[in-house]
Amino acid sequence: MNPAVVLFLALITSIILIILFTATIAIYHDFVTIEQNYNMTAYAQQQNTQANNVLVTGFRFLFIGLIGVTIALIIYQRRT
């Protein structure tokens, strides 16, 4: 299989993963917000902080991967 096709598929997969990750965190934040509105417990605050940490870390890794795949695709296109 052509390496450019593989890299392009990796790029599309990265974008899809970012969309799915964002949707998952948004749904999780909605549940945490509902819990906070009814009862602002220490557990809800902890879950909110944890969700924010997961969000930041996840996006960091996803965007680093996306940038890496994009750079690899550009380098491959210039060599051919």
Curated annotation (Swiss-Prot):
Gene Ontology cellular-component terms listed: host cell membrane; membrane
Membrane topology according to the record: Multi-pass membrane protein
Transmembrane residue ranges: 5-25, 55-75
Keyword Ribonucleoprotein listed: no
Location relative to the cell: Host membrane
Keywords for the protein's UniProt record, in alphabetical order: Host membrane, Membrane, Transmembrane, Transmembrane helix
The protein's name in its UniProt record: Putative transmembrane protein ORF80
